């Protein structure tokens, strides 16, 4: 699944990602697309808070592609 938050400033990308992660089983991967550079900081913080992890961060033509994986805390 891809969460497209291009054109939005933080905290919107993190909020959209959080909503998309709710109720997902552990080990599920999602990718966030964002153009706000703060997502590079906010998303890893969010994933630590939720018990998940950042798998990969790439940037192409000003678009961040951040792949995350759910952890156990998201199903509680």
Label every model-predicted segment.
Residues 1-3:
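Generic N-terminal amphipathic, Lys/Arg-enriched alpha-helix
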Residues 5-57:
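Amphipathic, hydrophobic secondary-structure cores in small proteins
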Residues 44-76:
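C-terminal structural segments of small proteins and small subunits
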């Amino acid at each position: 699944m891809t969460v497209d938050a291009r054109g939005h400033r933080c905290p919107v990308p993190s909020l959209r990602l959080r909503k998309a992660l709710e109720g997902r089983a552990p080990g599920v991967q999602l990718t966030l697309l964002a153009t706000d550079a703060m997502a590079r900081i906010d998303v890893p913080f969010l994933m630590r808070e939720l018990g998940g992890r950042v798998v990969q961060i790439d940037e192409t033509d000003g678009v961040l592609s951040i792949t995350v994986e759910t952890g156990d805390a998201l199903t509680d």
